[in-house]
Curated annotation (Swiss-Prot):
It comes from Arabidopsis thaliana. Keywords: ATP-binding, Cell membrane, Glycoprotein, Kinase, Lectin, Membrane, Nucleotide-binding, Receptor, Serine/threonine-protein kinase, Signal, Transferase, Transmembrane, Transmembrane helix. The chain crosses the membrane at residues 280-300. ATP binds at L341, G342, K343, G344, G345, F346, G347, Q348, V349, K364. In the C-terminal section; belongs to the protein kinase superfamily. Ser/Thr protein kinase family. In the N-terminal section; belongs to the leguminous lectin family. It catalyses: L-seryl-[protein] + ATP = O-phospho-L-seryl-[protein] + ADP + H(+); L-threonyl-[protein] + ATP = O-phospho-L-threonyl-[protein] + ADP + H(+). It comes from the Eukaryota. Residues 28-242 are annotated as: Legume-lectin like. This is Putative L-type lectin-domain containing receptor kinase V.6. Glycans are attached at N47, N59, N112, N171. One of its GO terms (molecular function) is protein serine/threonine kinase activity. Its EC number is 2.7.11.1. Residues 28-279 are extracellular. The gene is LECRK56.
């Protein structure tokens, strides 16, 4: 009935995509890459390693130039995990008995990065592609394509077929695990190539092909070509089954029928996998017992010691986000000493990383009953908590837990300005600021003050500007921070100062005389 019939079967090997088939003679095919014959006379195109490829090309030649032909083969892909395939395979016409230098993964064991797309390849392939590669402009991860000299298909369509009865399109999944038939028919007088996909139980493919290409293939091929298969694996595992049938060298749809469509075996498991499964079950039960005991213990713990985080009246009007104590505890690794950035009369500042992200933060912890602790805490939240400016340290949120108050800021990797200005003997390696950097820092602080005094809806008086409160970010931009002594006023309101606030240091002469500051200085 057929000029030549060759049955292809897969060797079931776990963890990898394998293409295997038996046929009349070992000498019929030339193997390359990972392709080998195993002890059962099966041809395995890929071995048990990831990112491998294999090739099997017929040693005899097939006359294609100015010729018609019809080729059919049956295949099935059984993935290890549902809805996840590998990269796919191709049926190819090649001028040589193999394709040297081919690569795995998206190159399907057919081409490589260098020769992909070159007209000198003289290769025509039908790809069964189950991985969408943007590099090759794939339409999806479940399609059939016609490729000429490269992996960017000249024609492609999602896997499926057109019903002969009503003409509707029926989708097929290439990784469904079901046996399918692919028919390739080329008519030389019409220079038309038709590719049709359908279920294996169809005696004859549907009349309307899935793909059609009106092109004279003689311009791309040599007179004599070799027929073969290529396949590649990536990091996703699956099993690929194929049954290949060569039909007459004519443009006909040859009836093909199985006595019974083969039932594909389930995905295989090695003996070691059974042991691994038993161990996994035992480990799961043990972990479940541990978690159950831990959960019961945690419930009893909560009954005796509850950490309540209830919003107080003053928090309702606050702008920034409230963090839970647990978030800050985990971020700072339990407020460990090695996370400490600095400390003083205000409390301690710790470095941390927010759980679930790479965002670095600085957490300032002060005591609720410390000197001006609560008032400074509220001042920070009510002022900088609602401000967003590139030269102001951003307050991300706050937390109140037991006797302690916490403020969360963006982390400034270069620390405060005073460490650059006051270089001690123990910090002689600290880099010096250039005059350009110093001038930029002055402008940054001025920009922050302009925003506070004139640009925002209210006037904010910082009242404690000093090098220790000017922080430097990773780009050496200055940011003004520590608004614990800040005061809010409405625009146009003239505040009456009753006492000096801030850190002792330089005090303007008018403060000593009147207790009030003026904008203009005379020296």
């Amino acid at each position: 009935m057929f000029s030549e019939v060759k049955v292809l079967q897969i060797v079931l090997v776990q963890w990898l995509t394998l293409f295997s088939f038996t046929y009349n003679s070992h000498g019929t095919y030339i193997l390359d890459g990972s392709a080998v014959f195993n002890e059962n006379s099966y041809l395995v195109l890929t071995n048990t390693t990831k990112h491998s490829y294999g090739q099997a090309f017929d040693n005899t030649t097939f006359e294609m130039k100015d010729q018609s032909f019809s080729i059919n083969f049956f295949f099935a892909i059984v993935p290890e995990h549902k809805q996840q395939g590998s990269h796919g395979m191709t049926f190819a016409f090649s001028p040589t008995r193999g394709l040297p230098g081919a690569s795995s993964d998206q190159y399907l064991g057919l081409f490589n990065k260098t020769n992909n797309g070159k007209t000198s390849n003289h290769v025509i392939a039908i790809e069964l592609d189950i991985h969408k590669d943007e590099e090759f402009e794939d339409i999806d991860d479940n399609h059939v394509g016609i490729n000429i000299n490269g992996l960017r298909s000249v024609a492609s369509a999602s896997a499926g077929y057109y019903d002969d009865n009503d003409g509707s399109f029926k989708n097929l999944s290439l990784i469904s695990g079901k046996l399918m038939r692919l028919s390739i028919v080329y008519s030389h007088p019409d220079t038309k190539l038709d590719v049709t996909l359908c279920p294996a139980e169809f005696l004859v493919p549907p009349r309307k092909p899935l793909l059609s290409l009106n092109r004279d293939l003689s311009q791309y091929v040599l007179k004599h070509m070799h027929i073969g298969f290529t396949a590649s694996t990536g990091s996703i595992r699956a099993l690929h089954y194929m049954v290949l049938v060569y039909t007459y060298p004519e443009a006909v749809y040859q009836p093909l029928e199985f006595g019974r469509v083969p039932t594909l075996p389930p995905y295989p498991k090695k003996p070691s996998d059974r042991l691994r499964t038993v161990l996994a079950v035992c480990l799961t039960l043990a972990l479940f017992a541990v978690f159950l005991a831990s959960g019961i213990g945690f419930v009893f713990y909560l009954r005796h010691k509850k950490v309540k985080e209830v919003l107080e009246e003053w928090e309702i009007q606050c702008g920034p986000h409230r963090f839970s104590y647990k978030e800050l505890f985990n971020a700072t690794k339990g407020f460990k000493e090695k996370q400490l950035l600095g400390k003083g009369g205000f409390g301690q500042v710790y470095k941390g990383t927010l759980p679930g992200s790479d965002a670095e933060i600085a957490v300032k912890r002060t005591s609720h009953d410390s000197r001006q602790g609560m008032s400074e805490f509220l001042a920070e939240i009510s002022t900088i908590g609602r401000l967003r400016h590139p030269n102001l340290v951003r307050l991300l949120g706050y937390c109140k837990h037991k006797e302690n108050l916490y403020l969360v800021y963006d982390f400034m990797p270069n620390g405060s300005l005073d460490k650059y200005l006051n270089r001690s003997n123990t910090n002689e390696n600290q880099e010096r600021l250039t005059w350009e950097q110093r001038f930029k820092i002055i402008k940054d602080v001025a920009s922050a003050l302009l925003h506070l005094h004139q640009e925002w809806v209210q006037v904010i008086i910082h009242r404690d500007i000093k090098p220790a409160n000017v922080l430097i970010d990773h780009d050496m931009n200055a940011r003004l921070g520590d608004f614990g002594l800040a005061k809010l006023y409405d625009q146009g309101f003239d505040p009456q100062t009753s006492r000096v606030a801030g850190t002792f240091g330089y005090i303007a002469p008018e403060f000593l005389r009147t207790g009030r500051a003026v904008r203009v200085k005379f020296f």
